[in-house]
């Protein structure tokens, strides 16, 4: 953190490391760059710095500990499963860490490739609104409780549900709504939450989706995946409307073409989405409003 004149104010180091028992098992062969923690969004509200992150391995944030979850592959090897969370720090000195929310696969050393695919959040006063994309059976833990989230998962036939879960956290209590979609057998994680923003009584969420749109099951992606924006009532979390880009960028499975979310802006109820597509290594930028 820096002061307004540019002087360094405080530094906070956050790290992830493999669970000691897993690391010494002789069955753990991490991929390059694993374990990790990747912060994707930060906001300041009421004297606190909030951050959302995806992680593998055990994460240490001051006194906060997020445990890594691992997959047992036929008792032959252990692999990292992706978890996510939101934490806060006092903005003045980046201390007094608190875990606001943490999401991870429910079963440690289970045999299925489950996990979190994306997370984001926004704040309003003392309220925190978050949304995450996920698959499988997960445990969602917040300050005053926890709940299990069970999504359709047929590992035998490869049919997996990729859902969006939206939550409002107020005074440590969570109100959660799951937006379901039909299962499919494409393992690629094209569902993402790129940005969230509140204007008036509306919570806007932008990102990408693949196959059936969880916020509006009448919509289906075109090409590899689609940009989307959805408007929710911030009090009930009910969906009001959802729009998609509808750009046919090519087949994301065979040609590796897919839309990538970069930003979203909301002004008096008008929403603009920004993203790009990489085709034959040539970047093509497009805008939808």
Regions found by a protein language model. Name each.
Residues 1-289:
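A sequence-level/structural motif corresponding to short, flexible coil/turn segments enriched
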């Amino acid at each position: 953190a820096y002061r307004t004149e540019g002087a360094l104010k405080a530094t906070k180091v956050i790290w992830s490391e493999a669970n000691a028992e897993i690391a010494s098992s002789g069955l753990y062969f991490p991929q390059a760059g694993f374990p990790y923690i990747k912060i994707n969004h930060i906001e300041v509200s009421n004297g606190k710095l909030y951050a959302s992150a995806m992680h593998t391995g055990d994460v240490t944030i001051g006194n906060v500990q997020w445990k890594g979850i691992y997959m047992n592959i036929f008792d032959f090897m252990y692999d990292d499963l992706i978890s996510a969370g939101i934490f806060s720090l006092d903005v003045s000195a980046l201390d007094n860490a608190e875990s606001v929310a943490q999401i991870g696969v429910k079963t440690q050393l289970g045999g299925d490739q489950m996990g979190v695919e994306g997370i984001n959040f926004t704040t309003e006063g003392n309220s925190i609104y978050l949304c995450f994309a996920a698959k499988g059976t997960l445990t969602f833990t917040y300050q005053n409780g926890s709940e299990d989230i069970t999504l359709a998962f047929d590992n035998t036939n490869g049919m997996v549900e990729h859902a969006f879960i939206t939550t409002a956290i107020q005074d440590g209590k969570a109100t959660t709504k799951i937006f379901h979609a039909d299962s499919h057998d494409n393992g690629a994680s094209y569902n993402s939450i790129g940005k969230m923003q509140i204007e008036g009584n509306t919570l806007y969420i932008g990102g990408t989706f693949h196959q059936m749109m969880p916020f509006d099951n009448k919509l289906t992606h075109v090409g590899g995946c689609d940009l989307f924006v959805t408007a929710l009532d911030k009090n009930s979390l009910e969906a009001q409307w959802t729009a998609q880009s509808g750009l046919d960028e090519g087949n994301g499975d065979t040609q590796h073409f897919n839309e990538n979310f970069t930003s979203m802006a909301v002004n008096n109820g008008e929403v603009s989405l920004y993203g790009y597509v990489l085709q034959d290594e040539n970047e093509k930028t497009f805008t939808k409003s």
